[in-house]
Structures are given as C-alpha cells and as structure tokens.
C-alpha cells in the first residue's frame, strides 16, 4: 500500500493520519500527528488461538525521551521500564478497547504505541488511544470498533476538550472519557469537589467530541481498511452444556446464594469439583479428553455467571442477600498502629484496608522526569494487594499495573482535599495495605486514607469516601448495584468507582465489559453513589470528626526562618560543608529554597531550636545601637577586639574604652574579660566599631573643660582580626577601623 494521508482539524489543532509508509509487516499501523505530537500505533495478532482461558490482549505505551528532546537519566542512558504515567496510559487505552472484541476471541493481540515527538499542548495519550483504535480498525484483526477518547477540563464554568498545558493549570477537572459513537465505555477523572450534574455534563460533552473522532476513523477505514480475518472463537459443546445444566444447574444455583464469601466459594467449588470428577472418569480414555474437560470448566463458569445475573435482574436478590442499593456493614478505626505518623483501618463487609501515613520534609518529594518538564511530586499514595487478602498464595513482589492504577486512583481522590504547601509544608505518603478483599478494595483504601490523614493531624479540607457501583444489563433492562462485591464485579457489566466529599466528587473510574452505557445509567449510578458516599462519611466522621490539631509525637516537627538571599551560601557553606555540620550536630533535616526560606525538620523540638540558633547566628549582622555583653578576645595598642557572635568581632578603640584618657588598653581591659559594648559604627566594608564608654556615666567637666585627666589625641589604625579564622561558622570578620585620634 502506498502512503496515504488523512487530515482534519480537531479542537483547534491539525489531526493528521498517515497509513502505508511504516511498519508494513504488522496487521495494522498508523502514524498519528496531533499538533506537534507524533505517535506510531501498531497492532499485531497471533495466527492461532491461545490456550489461555481469557483474551490475551497486551497494550503498551512507550515514551521515548528523544520525543521531548531530553536525554535519559540513569547509568545506561536509555529508556528502561515504563514510568508510572506510561503504565497508566497503557491501562487507559486497554480498558475501552478490550470490550470491543467478540466473546470467545482468544487470539493474542498486541497494540504498541510509541511517542516519537511530544507537544505538551497536544495530548499524546489521546493520540495513542486514537491510533490504537485506528490501527486495529484498518487491520484484519476482528475488532468491533472504532473507539476514541478525549480529555475534558472545566474552567470558568466552561468545558475544554483536549486542554493545553495552561488550560490544565486552571482547570477544576481532569477527565478522560472514551467510547464508541453510540456510548461511553471508559472514564477516569480527578475533580475538585464537583457536583454530579457537572460531572455528567462533562461526560456528555466529551462523548460529543468522541463521535467526531469516530466518524473520522470510519472514513479512513472505508478508504484503506483490510477485510477482517476469519478466526476461531472459543465455544463450548452445546450438547455438553445442555446436559450439565440439566443435571447440575439447581445445585450450583443454591451454592451461589450462600451469603458469606468463603462459605459460598467452598460450596460452589464443591459442586464444580463433583461435576469435573464425574466427567474425568467418564472420558478418561477419550482422545478429546482435554477439550471436553476444558469445556466442562467453562460451562460451569457460564452457569455461575448466568445465575448471579438472573438473581439480580429477575429476583432483585444479590448473592449475599443485600438489596441492590445496600452497603455492606461498615467499620472505621484510627490509631491502629503505634509509632507511625497516622493510621486508619476501614472495613466494608469482607473488604478491609489499613492505611499508614508518613510525613517528611519537602526534600523527600518524588522527582518525576518524563516527557513533560521535570517536577516534584509532594503526595504519594501506594496500594498493595497481597494474595493472602483473598486467601490464596501467589506472586509477591513489585507492584503490577493494577496496583499502580489503584494507588493513583486513591491519590487522585485524596489530593483534592490536601492543604497547600504553604499551609502544611510536608511531603505526604500514604500506603494502603489490603488485608482482606471481596471487591472494592481501592475504595476501601481511600476511606482508610482519609482516616489516617485526619488521625495524623493533616488539615484536609474535608473527609473523602469512595464507593464502587455495578451494573447488570440484558440489553433491555438493567439494574445498578451499590457497593459491588467480588462476585458481582466478576460477573457484572460495570465497575464504576466514585469518590468524593459531601460537597462533590473528587475522583471517578469506570470500566465496563459491554460496548457502552447510556447517559441514563450514568446519571442513576452517580445519584446512587452519592447516597452511599454520605452513609460512609457518617461512619468515618463517627470515628474522627475532624483532623487532629497536632501531629503525632513521632512525626517530624517543623520550624522556619527567613534569611537574606545573599546569606544562603553562608548557611550552605563550601560544598555544603556548613549545612552538613549543622545537620550532623543537631540531627535535623534542613531545606532551603531559592528565596531564603529555611525549613528545619525533626521530631525533637530541642534539636530544631539548636539548629535555628546556629543558623540565626550564621546570618546575623550587627546593627548600630545594639548592646552586647561579650568577651575581649584580642588586645592591640590601638584598642581591644571583642567577639560579638559567630565570626563577627568589633573593635573598641582605645578612645572608646573609658571617658578618661587611657594610656594602655590593658589598664582597662584584658583578654577574657566580659564587657558590655554598644555598636557605634559599621562601615561600608562591614567593619564594626563599638564603645564601652558610651554605656558609662559621663563624668562632669573640670575647670579646664576636660573630662578628668588631660585629653590626648592619638592616631593609629587597626587591621582585620584573625583570632577566629579557623571557625567554619562565621560569615565575616571585622577589619580594623580607620585611625582615630
């Protein structure tokens, strides 16, 4: 195929698609140019059906640092494992694409998106989602698309599609919505406590833009699309299915209705094992034994799936006996752990999450370096899902895509209510440990996170709660479920997570297994979620009504001091020598910003006070008129040097020692004497002159008009002292003042 180019203008930017020039051995490949962003999207499919009992779809999103004109970091100086943002983008693309393949499609499919050039004002993730759908659509892969996605911002009471970087800075909403021409099938959002009505409007506004992109894809497919390949779909033997259903359906249906999760799982497992054992014995010598037994396992899964859905849609009964809008029993507890900076334990039925708060200096913020300009991330929310939480053994190690995604969802929900850095200058980390799971563990982690933040004294604007909504639909009728459990998530059509405060929504996430849902379903789910959210907030607030006024004793305390910008180098010292010494001596952590704000962190207030005193002395400057009681550190013929503070000395000229004439300095003071002096002059070089006599009573004049003895004049000069030159803590030393008579 020769290169063909298609172009449209979308939201004020050119959207150009090139087909037939690159990656021609793949099933489908397109180059998408949106503004100055360029993404290569490639789709490939295996020739045969995979042996897995699921659809093996893999979506990758690769950020090449050269796309932004940046050099990769690290020792190897090349791209390594995907960043968190890249992982999340891959999930965003996977979620709306996956439902668009036929039931029983088991061929392995890979979709690879590579960002080749990057324009921060033209969304690379949305270009990649568009390219992924189009690469599949023009290929021979049996994909029932196309789909498209857009970003939606909300500022000045207006919605902005695919906002620029500057638009995002002022937006109250960060929404990504995807779908087909007919319906929405994926949502991901963070919001600043927006109402359900505004969120629904944003979703519908986004869907209008999606329709335009889908039309453009259909136009391209009509021009260059390949004929779809004939592939074998996984199907069970119809006669075998009818036979098993006739004998075992009622038995399995009874097991499904056992209310307690572990008991229900044991009951359904017993039925399935009985059926499987029967057919293993019956077909022990059959050459198609493996195929038959595979079909038996799939048929039993389909029977359980059908019964769960029938119970809900026809009988309006859920497997655990709840009403469709009923939440499982709730419990909230704070201070579950000693020593930590804050902790919260939240339980909803058989789902339980422990959240642990850690506060740290701002120097511990995470440095994020990707295609966007480097920035520091202050708030981290990490989510861990060990297999013991569902009573199983399994892989234990680094977090997978699901754990990363759930962690960021909680981060998005809670970030909206955190105090500003000016109000609360701490880096904040929450870790959610899922201890038990029967669905909606990500939302339990949000509730537990709220408890930990409030218990730890973080002054959040309002508590946040999360709830997961479900859907069972037969194409004509549907039922929206509140607080779905694992079985309903597994066999249902939708997982719609809604988090927020009493004022509004802070996060949304929706995944579905059908091609899309209508605005009516969205509206009902949001309204039902609001009622549930308020019920959960009642329980959270009964455990702790508002954030504590003080941090935990183990949390780092903070104090600050403002220093002149030109003194920053004094506090830091050569190669960090001075600040390192302060930290070593006091055990504190010190942050200094470019405007001279010094923040001192420690769990020991005395250590903070010591460090603050040292820093104050380092940057301290004498002022004319100040009075000090200080030691005499050096004697010269022309006067005495006294040590004011740090490395700052002052000269008390011989004429300023006493009102009467002084022949020798030693007649008045000696090294080591403590004297009280007043600063009388600071010259342009910072040299300090002080006086003792100005603080003494002035004697009355005698008959000759002199103060006591004959007043004599002397001319002498003094030089910069070196008595304290070895100290590291002095910003400056006094030089000798000019000759005085």
Swiss-Prot record:
What EC number(s) is this enzyme filed under? 2.7.7.8
Q: Where is the signal peptide?
A: none
GO terms in the biological process aspect are: mRNA catabolic process; RNA processing
Q: Where in the cell is it found?
A: Cytoplasm
- Name any GO cellular component annotation: cytosol
Kindly state which keywords UniProt assigns to this record, in alphabetical order.
Answer: Cytoplasm, Magnesium, Metal-binding, Nucleotidyltransferase, RNA-binding, Transferase
Residues that bind Mg(2+): 489, 495
The record ties this protein, via CDD domains, to: KH-I_PNPase, RNase_PH_PNPase_1, RNase_PH_PNPase_2
Q: Composition bias, kind Basic and acidic residues: at what positions?
A: 698-713, 723-741
Where the record annotates domain KH, the positions are 556-615
Q: Which cofactor does it need?
A: Mg(2+)
What is this enzyme's class at the first EC digit? transferase
Q: Name one Pfam family in it.
A: RNase_PH_C
Q: What is its main location?
A: cytoplasm
Q: Where is this region: Disordered?
A: 696-741
Specify the S1 motif domain's residue ranges: 625-693
* Gene Ontology molecular function terms on file: 3'-5'-RNA exonuclease activity; magnesium ion binding; polyribonucleotide nucleotidyltransferase activity; RNA binding
* Catalyzed reaction equations: RNA(n+1) + phosphate = RNA(n) + a ribonucleoside 5'-diphosphate
The family classification in the record reads: Belongs to the polyribonucleotide nucleotidyltransferase family.
Described by its record, this protein's role is as follows:
Involved in mRNA degradation. Catalyzes the phosphorolysis of single-stranded polyribonucleotides processively in the 3'- to 5'-direction.
Its protein name is Polyribonucleotide nucleotidyltransferase
Gene this protein is translated from: pnp
């Amino acid at each position: 195929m020769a290169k063909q180019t298609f172009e449209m203008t979308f939201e004020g930017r050119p959207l150009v698609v090139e087909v037939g020039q690159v990656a021609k051995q793949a099933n489908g490949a397109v180059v998408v140019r949106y503004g100055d962003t360029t993404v290569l999207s490639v789709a490939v499919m295996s020739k045969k059906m995979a042996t897995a009992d699921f659809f093996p779809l893999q979506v990758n999103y690769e950020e090449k640092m050269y796309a932004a004109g940046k050099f990769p970091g690290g020792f190897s100086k090349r791209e390594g494992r995907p960043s968190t943002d890249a992982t999340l983008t891959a999930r965003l693309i996977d979620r709306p694409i996956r439902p668009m393949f036929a039931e029983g499609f088991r061929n392995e499919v890979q979709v690879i998106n590579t960002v080749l050039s990057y324009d921060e004002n033209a969304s690379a993730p949305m270009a990649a989602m568009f390219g992924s759908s189009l690469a599949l659509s023009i290929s021979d892969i049996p994909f029932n698309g196309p789909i498209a996605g857009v970003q939606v911002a909300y500022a000045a009471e207006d919605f902005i599609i695919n906002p620029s970087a500057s638009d995002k800075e002022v937006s109250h909403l960060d929404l990504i919505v995807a779908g087909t021409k007919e319906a929405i099938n994926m949502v991901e959002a963070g919001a600043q406590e927006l109402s359900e009505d505004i969120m629904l409007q944003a979703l519908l506004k986004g869907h209008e833009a999606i329709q335009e992109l889908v039309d453009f894809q259909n136009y391209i497919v009509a021009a260059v699309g390949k004929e779809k390949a004939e592939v074998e779909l996984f199907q069970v033997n119809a006669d075998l299915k009818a036979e098993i259903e006739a004998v075992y359906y009622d038995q399995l249906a009874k097991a499904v209705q056992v209310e307690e999760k572990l008991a229900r799982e044991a009951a359904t497992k017993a039925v399935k094992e009985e059926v499987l054992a029967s057919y293993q014995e019956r077909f022990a010598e059959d050459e198609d034994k493996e195929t038959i037994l595979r079909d038996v396992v799939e048929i039993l899964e389909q029977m359980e799936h059908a019964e769960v859905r029938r119970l809900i849609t026809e009988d309006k009964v859920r497997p655990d006996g709840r009403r469709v809008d009923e939440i499982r029993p709730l419990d909230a507890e704070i201070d579950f752990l000693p020593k930590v900076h804050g902790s919260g334990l939240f339980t909803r039925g058989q789902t339980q999450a422990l959240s642990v708060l850690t506060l740290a200096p701002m120097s511990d913020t995470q440095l994020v370096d990707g295609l966007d300009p480097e920035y520091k991330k202050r708030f981290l929310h990490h989510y861990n899902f060990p297999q013991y939480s569902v009573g199983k053994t399994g892989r234990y190690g680094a977090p997978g895509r699901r754990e990363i995604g759930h962690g960021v969802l909680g981060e998005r929900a809670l970030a909206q209510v955190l105090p500003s850095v000016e109000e609360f200058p701490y880096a904040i980390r929450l870790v959610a440990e899922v201890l038990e799971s029967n669905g909606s563990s990500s939302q339990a982690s949000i509730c537990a996170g709220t408890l930990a933040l409030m218990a730890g004294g973080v002054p959040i604007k309002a508590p946040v709660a999360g709830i997961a909504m479900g859907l069972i639909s037969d194409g004509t009728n549907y039922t929206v479920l509140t607080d779905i459990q694992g079985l309903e998530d597994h066999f249902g059509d939708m997982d719609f997570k809604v988090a927020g405060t009493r004022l509004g929504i802070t996060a949304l996430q929706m995944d579905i297994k059908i091609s899309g849902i209508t605005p009516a379903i969205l509206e009902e789910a949001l309204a039902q979620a609001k009622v549930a959210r308020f019920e959960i907030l009642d329980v959270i607030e009964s455990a702790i009504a508002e954030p504590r006024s003080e941090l935990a004793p183990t949390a780092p305390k903070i104090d600050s001091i403002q220093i002149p910008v030109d003194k920053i180098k004094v506090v830091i010292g050569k190669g960090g020598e001075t600040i390192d010494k302060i930290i070593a001596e006091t055990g504190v952590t010190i942050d200094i910003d470019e405007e001279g704000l010094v923040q001192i962190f420690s769990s020991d207030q005395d250590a903070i006070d010591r460090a603050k005193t040292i820093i104050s002395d380092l940057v301290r400057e004498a002022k004319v008129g100040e009075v000090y009681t200080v030691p005499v550190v050096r004697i010269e013929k022309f006067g005495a040097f006294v040590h004011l503070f740090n490395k700052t000395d002052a000269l008390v000229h011989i004429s300023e020692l006493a009102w009467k004439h002084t022949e020798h300095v030693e007649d008045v003071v000696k090294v080591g004497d403590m004297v009280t002096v007043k600063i009388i002059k600071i010259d342009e070089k910072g040299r300090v002159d002080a006086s003792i006599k100005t603080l003494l009573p002035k004697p009355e004049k005698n008959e000759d008009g002199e103060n006591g003895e004959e007043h004599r004049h002397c001319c002498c000069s003094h030089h910069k002292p070196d008595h304290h030159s070895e100290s590291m803590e002095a910003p400056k030393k006094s030089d000798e003042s000019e000759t005085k008579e």
